[in-house]
Amino acid sequence: MSRYLVLYRANASVWPVDPKESLAVLEGVFAGGDQLLRTGMATEIGWFTAQEGYAIFQADSKDSVVGMIQPFFPYYSQDVHEIVPWDQAKNAILENARRAAAR
């Protein structure tokens, strides 16, 4: 299984301006986040500001993660990045650099 970093940011243009409607959206967002954590789909969710944050997922594929975060759109835009473990990335990068240097 791979790990994925999701960076999310609120889309202010689609949020309701009525405070009661905005509260309803926030309650739904937090309930969704709680569900992702409770089921283990997300291993960590955090905030940088009140408008943007991150989540860490462990999943079989990027498209699985995209499916899990789709319900938060259009209120939040997300960027999904696969996390390559240090040793795997180091070995791949050095192997390619050594091949290029040997030419």
For every predicted segment, state its role.
Residues 2-103:
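Conserved, structured core segments of small domains
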